[in-house]
């Protein structure tokens, strides 16, 4: 997250896509950024796939960990914002990048490294019955579908449409995988619409492919143009129907619709035209590299990853030079490049100029090149440990305080301050300081019960739209926990000091996110207040109406025998802290983000008809703190089962590595009122009890006989992680509020 002491932002550089060139920009930026420039990475998913290793993955030579690059920690190492949202358009007039599902973002300079899609998807049945190899990340996720088809039949026929380099490698990879799984009766059929395989490659390389295919039982047909795909078959031009149990579509590159209507000059295929500096023609502020770009300073370049790799250093220099006022360099593509085709079984074909070679040594070279390249950008391993290549590099985050609900005053400090203050009284107060709860409630002179709450926190990410959404979801949660439907809200936003246009953009993004969340819950934003300060702080006052004082679900009604049900998984605190340090995998942060964005509205609607004894929402004080308050107010004790706690992916692993939210030590004071059994003291999930939650779930005490019905209703409503985590018990003679056991 951007430090409040950082230089004022004067230039917004936005990278769209996590391709082979942009990852080089990120790594270089981590070593030497440009003062006053804010770097933003926009991707549709937080993981990039190295395309050169995908055939090896299909063949079973690599795991996903071998070929995936986690973009989020790489971006955070560079001090960049990371926004996960598909880019769907560009407005060059206003310099806005159009995103799917959220407002456009502003740029001063924008660079595209978004690749391409597969040609021919518009043909009948292709989208429905074939698996395209682009987007490459989606193809990797669907490889198991292809293999499942082959495994389900003794003599499955897999058809690969397109015999360029990609199609050849996929066909050989599938054949090798079938042989490796002893499914030798399966058949791989490679179809090419043109007169020969490997169009554009040396004839000697094509001859080697034909010979290697014959030796491995791969059938190749040229002059076979597919016109339609249906369940169980492909149709060729001329009317021939070929049986096919599975179809992989590798029929060349096509442009993405991203640049349609953007006012950028494109070639006949829709690829954006660039000059040697990698800038788009007529728009110096727009750069493009890799497959999405069309080269204009000479013969067109093949759609091959090697060009994006070689463009990376030039792009990095030119982006920095444009911001800093330096001289831009020209990219000079090589006249030919070494192409290495994986045959899937330990061999490979290499070709450059008109020469081709084949053998295990060729694959060994390819494997060494590919693994070395990917390792340069892998910040974390599968378990979240820092990889050797990044172990010595400076860590972002430092001693920065956590944002979100971890930025609250600790429970003990809050309690002592209120005790010193004293409790004012008024006959209209139904819930107030005399009976602390998640929300306040007062009775009007007309007998209406108005429930209200206020909540705010420091930004937990450099994404004001996301912060606004989460802050709104978090604020209304207090009312949902009381069984009250929120109706109206006021905003309180402190925007970091900046030039007027950037301050306006920050405020707009915050309020757009907040409004999206509030309106989804039926809440109308009716006003608010803004200030400027050192950092972004977002809060809301929210109120609604209860039918009567008796319908309020209070925190203090839990009774012995009640089941304790938690509706959301735990771990947002440690994941957000790890994210500040670039120590959290992108998929972990995405899971945490999804749970923070999930409103407790559905859970409340499932809860209210089943008449719970008590409820609260789990936020900054952690599960132990909020449960302790429930039990203390209810004059009861409770039993928690650590094995039953739902946890976000990565949370327990990060806690095991010693990472803690800055609020964790204060929350851990709750252990003084706990009896932790010896088996629980050694349990990996113990520290989850003290992890501060941002926009956490509801903690519900419900009579045991209604517990199963509530759990079923919660899961049916979308709270799939909801779980029974313990039970309420009578007060203990030793005074302990919570007894913690490992298992039930």
Q: Can you annotate each of these PLM segments?
A:
Residues 113-114, 237, 250-251, 289-292, ...:
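Short, well-ordered coil/turn residues at beta-beta hairpins
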Residues 77, 82-89, 93-94, 105, ...:
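A Rossmann-like FAD-binding core segment of flavoenzymes
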Residues 260, 292-342:
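A conserved FAD-binding loop/helix module that cradles the flavin
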Residues 128-154, 232-235, 241-310:
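FAD-site-proximal beta/loop scaffold in flavoenzymes
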Residues 2-3, 9, 345-393:
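C-terminal auxiliary extensions adjacent to catalytic cores
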Residues 2-81, 160, 168-201:
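Beta1-alpha1 glycine-rich phosphate/pyrophosphate-binding loop at the start
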Residues 391-744:
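Helix-biased detector of long, well-ordered alpha-helical tracts
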Residues 2-10, 79-161, 248:
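FAD-binding core/adjacent interface of flavoenzyme oxidoreductases
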């Amino acid at each position: 997250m951007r430090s409040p002491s950082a230089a004022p932002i004067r230039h917004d550089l936005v990278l769209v896509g996590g391709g082979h060139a942009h990852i080089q920009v990120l790594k270089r930026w981590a070593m030497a950024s440009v003062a006053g420039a804010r770097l933003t990475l926009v991707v549709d998913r937080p993981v990039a796939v190295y395309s050169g290793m995908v055939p090896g993955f299909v063949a079973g030579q690599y795991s996903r960990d071998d070929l995936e690059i986690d973009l989020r920690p790489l971006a955070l190492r560079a001090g960049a914002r990371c926004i996960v949202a598909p880019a769907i358009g560009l407005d060059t007039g206003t310099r806005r990048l159009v995103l799917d599902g959220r407002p456009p973002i502003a740029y001063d300079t924008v660079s595209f490294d978004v690749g391409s899609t597969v040609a021919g998807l518009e043909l009948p049945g292709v989208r429905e019955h074939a698996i395209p190899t682009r987007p490459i990340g989606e193809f990797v996720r669907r490889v198991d579908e292809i293999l499942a088809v082959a495994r389900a039949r003794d003599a499955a026929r897999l058809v690969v449409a397109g015999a360029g380099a990609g199609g050849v490698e996929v066909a050989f990879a599938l054949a090798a995988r079938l042989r490796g799984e002893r499914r030798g009766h399966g058949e791989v059929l490679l179809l090419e619409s043109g007169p020969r395989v490997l169009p554009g490659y040396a004839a000697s390389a094509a001859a080697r492919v034909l010979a290697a295919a014959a030796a491995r039982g791969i059938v190749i047909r040229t002059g076979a143009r597919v016109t339609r795909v249906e369940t169980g078959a492909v149709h060729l031009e001329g009317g021939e129907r070929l049986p096919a149990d599975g179809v992989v579509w590798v029929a060349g590159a096509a442009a993405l619709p991203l640049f349609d209507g953007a006012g950028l000059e494109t070639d006949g295929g829709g690829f954006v035209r660039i000059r040697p500096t990698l800038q788009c023609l007529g728009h110096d502020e727009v750069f493009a590299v890799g497959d999405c770009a069309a080269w204009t300073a000479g013969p067109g370049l093949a759609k091959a990853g090697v060009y994006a790799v070689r463009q990376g250093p030039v792009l990095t220099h030119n982006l920095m030079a444009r911001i800093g006022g330096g001289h831009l360099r020209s990219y000079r593509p090589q006249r030919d490049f070494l192409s290495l085709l994986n045959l899937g079984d330990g061999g490979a074909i290499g070709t450059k100029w008109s020469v081709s070679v084949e053998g295990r040594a060729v694959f060994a070279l390819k494997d060494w090149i590919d693994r070395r390249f990917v390792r340069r950008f892998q910040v974390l391993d599968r378990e979240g440990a820092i990889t050797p290549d990044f172990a010595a590099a400076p860590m972002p985050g430092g001693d920065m305080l956590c944002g979100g609900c971890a930025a609250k005053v600790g429970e003990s400090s809050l309690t002592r301050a209120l005790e010193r203050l004293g409790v004012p009284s008024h006959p209209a107060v139904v819930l107030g300081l005399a009976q602390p709860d998640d929300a306040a409630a007062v009775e009007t002179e007309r007998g209406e019960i108005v429930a209200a709450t206020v909540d705010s926190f420091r930004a937990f990410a450099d994404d004001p739209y996301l912060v606004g959404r989460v802050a709104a979801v978090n604020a209304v949660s207090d009312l949902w926990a009381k069984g009250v439907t929120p109706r109206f809200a006021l905003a309180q936003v402190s925007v970091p000091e900046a030039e007027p246009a950037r301050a306006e953009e920050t405020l707009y993004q915050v309020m757009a996110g907040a409004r999206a969340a509030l309106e989804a819950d039926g809440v109308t934003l009716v006003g608010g207040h803004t200030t400027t300060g050192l950092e972004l702080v977002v809060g809301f006052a929210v109120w609604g109406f209860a039918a009567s004082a008796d319908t309020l679900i209070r925190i203090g009604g839990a009774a012995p025998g009640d089941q304790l049900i938690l509706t959301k998984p735990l771990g947002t605190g440690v994941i957000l802290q790890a994210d500040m340090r670039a120590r959290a995998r992108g998929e972990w942060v995405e899971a945490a983000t999804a749970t923070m964005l999930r409103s407790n509205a559905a859970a409340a609607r499932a809860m209210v008809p089943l008449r719970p004894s008590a409820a609260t929402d789990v936020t900054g004080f952690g599960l132990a703190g909020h449960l302790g308050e429930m039990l203390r107010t209810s004059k009861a004790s409770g039993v928690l089962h650590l094995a039953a706690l739902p946890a976000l992916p990565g949370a327990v692993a990060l806690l095991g590595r010693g990472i803690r939210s800055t609020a964790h030590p204060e929350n851990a004071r709750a252990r003084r009122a706990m009896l932790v059994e010896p088996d629980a003291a050694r349990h990996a999930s113990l520290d989850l009890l003290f992890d501060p939650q941002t926009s956490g779930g509801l903690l519900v005490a419900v009579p045991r006989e209604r517990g199963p019905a509530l759990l079923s209703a919660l899961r049916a409503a979308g709270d799939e992680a909801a779980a029974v985590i313990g039970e309420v018990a009578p007060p203990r003679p030793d005074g302990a509020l919570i007894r913690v056991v490992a298992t039930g």
